[in-house]
Curated annotation (Swiss-Prot):
The keyword Transmembrane applies. GO terms for molecular function: heme binding; iron ion binding; long-chain fatty acid omega-hydroxylase activity. One of its GO terms (biological process) is lipid metabolic process. Its cofactor is heme. The lineage of its organism: Eukaryota, Metazoa, Chordata, Craniata, Vertebrata. It is a multi-pass membrane protein. Belongs to the cytochrome P450 family. PROSITE patterns: CYTOCHROME_P450. The chain crosses the membrane at residues 6-26, 110-130. The keyword Oxidoreductase applies. Gene3D superfamilies: Cytochrome P450. Its EC number is 1.14.14.80. Heme binds at residue 451. It comes from Sus scrofa (Pig). This is Cytochrome P450 4A25.
């Protein structure tokens, strides 16, 4: 290479280096200004000292995340700041008055967090905002009309009985049983039959096991990514081991939901089937989506349809499985309340061969115990919002637009200022006529964006608890105490292990 050519190449390299340095300095300045803005915005909300780079991440290690969280609840009234890392912070909220103010507004889901779910569940009802969310919610609400929910009780009972029959065989060999796995298969079986018109059994289908495992992987990977500044960039994440694992798990989940959609489409294309569906007064969840796609194609794309199915396939089974598993654990840990529930159910159902819609409102003490377990172990431990405009709370403190609020349902339910002796299992808190703040108990979130399927979930929990208590006596396995982990859904790191005894 000639001397002039070398000089030219050297000059280009210097220019590129200077541009790279300039971009690096601009990014550093941007991050510095972002941190200064956050420090000023959060000055009314104290917190433990945080590191300028990794924030409070060392405080919230996976094994002990709940303990520092509950210490904050006791030390800092109503809310406090939490730094994920140097340039990302949020305000943890665990006061019912604060919750009420936030949920009365139509604030969007925090995009910096919820966008990480898009490769998995797409932009369905959970992630949509604004007018699009309102239209989709209005379209899907009829799928949870009580006329639709009534016959679901029989389907729920059949799925529960399949699970209990399996348990009976297993405990004949070993009374110790991990329940989260089989409960998840049972709730998946239920949602597929009720909301997706599925004719098979997810509890005997091998593909369902791979779907359940994929969901567990996706939840864990989401939690890991939300806590890592390095993994926020999409390109870096896709190239990382976690990103590749996330892609594989999402593909398995999508294959499962695609099969469900295609199977129902094929059923609707049979002669006369579409006309029969149109004549129904109330349609189930998937039929609403498919008819909207077939008859009003522009209003719902194939991508939209799959996103809703992915969302409800996950939410419709996993949160309910968490709730049922923790309820059974709570009753196993408190045999006196378990026996009182059993006696109530025996008086109502007798031999337990059938349970109907009308029975569900006739088990008040069991319902009290279910609600108290949901207080202690809320299936969705928190939701996040991003302020679209400034907000002022009842105590006079305020926050500007752009701040992320983490509405910590778990912390709210364990707040001693809201619930005296919060770690005690006390079903009388939910006795008829007992008074409490309207936003003190939020297992299904609150406001206009509360869980659309909350009645479905409560019905399924009642059916599962009632039929289980009629057939088994439950006790905790003292050698395997659950380790509670608050991810997308509250779960135990080491499963939930019980000892079961078949009742005569």
């Amino acid at each position: 290479m000639t001397v002039p050519a070398l000089a030219s190449a050297s000059g280009l390299l210097q220019v590129a280096s200077l541009l790279g340095l300039l971009l690096l300095l601009l990014k550093a300045a941007q991050l510095y200004l972002r941190r200064q803005w956050l420090l000023k915005a959060l000055q009314q909300f104290p917190s433990p000292p945080s590191h300028w780079l990794y924030g409070h991440s060392r405080e919230f290690q996976e094994e002990s995340e709940l303990q520092p969280l509950l210490k904050r609840v006791e030390k800092y009234p109503s809310a406090c700041a939490r730094w994920l890392w140097g340039t990302r912070a949020m305000v943890l909220v665990y006061d019912p008055d604060y919750m009420k103010v936030v949920l009365a507004r139509s604030e969007p889901k925090a995009p910096v967090l919820y966008r990480l779910l898009i490769p998995w569940i797409g932009c369905g009802l959970l992630l949509l905002n604004g007018q699009t969310w309102f239209q989709r919610r209005r379209m899907l609400t009829p799928a949870f009309h009580y006329d639709i929910l009534k016959p679901y009780v029989g389907l729920m009972a059949k799925s529960v009985q399949v699970m209990l029959d399996k348990w009976e065989q297993l405990v004949a060999q070993d009374p110790r049983l991990e329940i989260v796995g089989p409960v998840s298969l049972m709730t998946l079986d239920t949602i597929m039959k009720c909301a997706f018109s599925h004719q098979g059994s997810a509890q005997t289908d091998g593909d369902s096991h791979s779907y359940i495992q994929a969901i567990w992987d996706l939840k864990n990977l989401f939690s890991i990514r939300t806590k890592s500044a390095f993994l926020q960039n999409d390109i870096i994440y896709r190239l990382s081991p976690e990103g590749r694992k996330n892609h594989r798990a999402a593909r398995i989940a999508h294959q499962h939901t695609d099969r469900v959609i295609q199977l129902r489409k094929a059923q609707l294309q049979k002669q006369g089937e579409m006309e029969n569906v149109r004549k129904k007064r109330h349609l189930d969840f998937l039929d609403i989506l498919l008819l909207a796609r077939m008859e009003k194609g522009n209003s719902l794309s194939d991508t939209d349809l799959r996103a809703e199915v992915d969302t409800f396939m996950f939410e419709g089974h996993d949160t309910t499985a968490s709730g049922i598993s923790w309820i059974l654990y709570a009753l196993a840990s408190h045999p006196e309340h378990q026996q009182r529930c059993r006696e109530e159910i025996q008086g109502l159902l007798g031999d337990g061969t059938s349970i109907t819609w009308d029975h569900l409102d006739q088990m008040p003490y069991t319902t009290m115990c279910i609600k108290e377990a949901l207080r202690l172990y809320p299936p969705v431990p928190g939701v996040s919002r991003e302020l679209s405009k400034p907000i002022t709370f009842p105590d006079g403190r305020s926050l500007p637009a752009g701040i992320i609020l983490s509405l910590s349902v778990y912390s709210l339910h364990h707040n001693p200022q809201v619930w005296p002796n919060p770690e005690e299992f006390d079903p009388s808190r939910f006795a008829p006529g007992s008074a409490r703040h309207s936003h003190a108990f939020m297992p299904f979130s609150g406001g206009s964006r509360n869980c659309i399927g909350k009645q479905f979930a409560m019905n399924e929990m009642k059916v599962a608890v009632a039929l289980t208590l009629l057939r088994f006596e439950l006790a905790p396995d003292p050698s395997r105490k659950p380790t509670v982990i608050p991810e997308v859904v509250l779960h135990s790191k080491n499963g939930i292990h019980l000892k079961l005894r078949k009742l005569p």
